[in-house]
Amino acid sequence: MRKVVLASASPRRKELLSKLIGNNFEVCVSSYEETPLQEMNVEELVVFHSLEKAKDVALRFDSGIIISADTVVFCDGAILGKPHTLNNAKEMLENISGKSVLAITGMTILDMDSGKCVSEYVSTDVNMKQMSSDEIASYVNSGEPLDKAGAFAIQGKGAVLVESINGDFFNVVGLPLFRLGTILEEMGISIFDDC
């Protein structure tokens, strides 16, 4: 199998990629610093960030496939990344309570051997339940929201805050597996070889 490198420190992305290709990859965290760029819309921004992460990590390798991603939640015209404090998480949850939000992941797959690069985004509609102040406080105090875009983990306790989704569930977690699997197959990484 060809070398695959995940350009992410996210334990969730690592777990998701292992669902597709087992543990046949290495992790190399990008040193690229994400900054908001006013001239870009949210979709362009997450794609740009994922591309810059992939390019940064590619400098450390001679061959292989680099996978990078950037996920945000978009609500009422605002980009919600990861909350930095408990109060910030509380404010985000109050903002998205009872609303439909978008989980948007920019993803780059860079084949260093062929030079092929796919950079695109995947969106998933997420309908949040109307949350009480007590629910928000309890969830925030659990600590789970702190390293999650939009301050909720659909794959954890935050699942009870989500009424429904339309789109790729794994995209909300941080890596759109359907689209990623398709691209990897196109690049010669067989998902079903070991089945």
UniProtKB/Swiss-Prot annotation:
Keywords: Cytoplasm, Hydrolase, Nucleotide metabolism. GO terms for cellular component: cytoplasm. InterPro entries: ITPase-like_fam, Maf-like. It comes from the Archaea. The record marks R12, T71, Q155 as: Important for substrate specificity. Its main location: cytoplasm. One of its GO terms (biological process) is nucleotide metabolic process. PANTHER family: BIFUNCTIONAL DTTP/UTP PYROPHOSPHATASE/METHYLTRANSFERASE PROTEIN-RELATED, BIFUNCTIONAL DTTP_UTP PYROPHOSPHATASE_METHYLTRANSFERASE PROTEIN-RELATED. Nucleoside triphosphate pyrophosphatase that hydrolyzes dTTP and UTP. May have a dual role in cell division arrest and in preventing the incorporation of modified nucleotides into cellular nucleic acids. This is dTTP/UTP pyrophosphatase. It comes from Methanococcoides burtonii (strain DSM 6242 / NBRC 107633 / OCM 468 / ACE-M).
